[in-house]
Regions:
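Acidic-basic catalytic patches of nuclease active cores, encompassing PD-(D/E)XK
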Residues: 1-38
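Conserved catalytic cores of phosphodiester-cleaving nucleases, focusing on short active-site segments
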Residues: 28, 47-76, 88
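Short, low-complexity, intrinsically disordered N-terminal peptides in bacterial proteins
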Residues: 1-15, 56-57, 105-108, 123-125
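Mixed-charge, glycine-accented linear interaction segment located at domain edges/termini
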Residues: 40-42
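Catalytic cores of nucleic-acid endonucleases
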Residues: 3-4, 66-122
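Short, low-complexity, polybasic intrinsically disordered segments
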Residues: 118-138
Length: 138
């Protein structure tokens, strides 16, 4: 998997996002996905997860993970606006142009998709985290 920024230099908010990315990665693996990279640098963009979805159809997927501690300021999905989508698409384009991850791993020749996974704390203590997977957001 691709190298990533060491957690010891990340802010508490970034570490919470890292934990959400870890959990999303575990869930995708449990669904048969293959994780190719985490926090992948593509130009000025950082792509949260790069994976292959076994399909059908089998696809190369860039996954944006959005985390919120509560709904007080809206849903995690609401943080992905048009500007963020443009930034993500540009990062995906740079990654595809390179044809490989920063660690040298070649990208598979597959259809490409951009997904969003929203993560929220449980509604009540003791319940699991809540996940919503939005496929093909842009």
């Amino acid at each position: 998997m691709a190298a990533h920024v060491p957690t010891e230099v990340r802010t508490p908010s970034q570490r919470a996002g890292d934990a959400a990315e870890d959990e999303v990665g575990r869930r995708l693996l449990a669904l048969g996905w293959a994780l190719l990279g985490r926090r992948v640098r593509a130009g000025r963009s950082e792509l949260d997860l790069v994976a292959t979805d076994p399909g059908p159809p089998r696809s190369l997927v860039v996954v944006e993970v959005r985390w919120r501690r509560s709904r007080n300021f809206g849903l995690p999905e609401e943080t992905v606006d048009r500007r963020k989508l443009v930034h993500l698409r540009a990062g995906v384009g740079r990654l595809l142009e390179a044809g490989r991850l920063p660690d040298g791993t070649d990208l598979p020749d597959l259809p490409v998709r951009l997904d969003l996974v929203a993560v929220e704390p449980p509604a009540r203590q003791g319940e699991p985290l809540r996940f919503r997977h939005h496929r093909g957001i842009g």
